[in-house]
């Protein structure tokens, strides 16, 4: 049985991340759940929605991914996983989610480790070497002067 993945994030990030994952991994739609937290949402209401979304997975294999540690979605997620077997990781990004989807069949501990590594490895500096970014001959400033 696969672990399930619940994304709790500021709207519309959770749904957007899930949509991206479904674009690539459509077969896992039942295992990935998104909960968008609206700006005016009350934490108690969001927690109730999260409990409903998590269902029985809370004790049978749930990885919760949230966006910003200390923000409302993460605080709700912390309350959700407290006293359960679920794992929680803050700082969700697309590489983390893709890694989670690919390894959702592993143990929850292994899945959480892979998710965290995937998120961190997905962040890297990228050099700009495309031709349009290289220095080349410039036009004389007068080239752009036009009579009005």
What are these regions (language model features)?
Residues 1-65, 69-148:
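N-terminal loops that bind phosphate or other acidic moieties
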């Amino acid at each position: 049985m696969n672990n399930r993945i619940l994304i709790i994030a500021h709207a519309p990030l959770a749904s957007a991340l899930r949509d991206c994952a479904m674009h690539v991994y459509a077969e896992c739609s039942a295992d990935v759940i998104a909960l968008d937290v609206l700006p005016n949402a009350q934490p108690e209401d969001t927690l109730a929605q999260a409990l409903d979304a998590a269902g029985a997975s809370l004790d049978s294999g749930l990885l919760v991914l949230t966006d910003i540690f200390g923000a409302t979605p993460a605080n709700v997620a912390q309350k959700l996983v407290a006293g359960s077997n679920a794992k929680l990781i803050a700082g969700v990004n697309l590489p983390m989610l893709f890694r989670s989807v690919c390894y959702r069949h592993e143990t929850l501990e292994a899945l959480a480790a892979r998710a965290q590594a995937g998120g961190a490895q997905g962040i890297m500096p990228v050099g700009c070497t495309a031709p349009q970014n290289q220095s080349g001959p410039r036009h004389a400033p007068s080239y752009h002067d036009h009579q009005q």
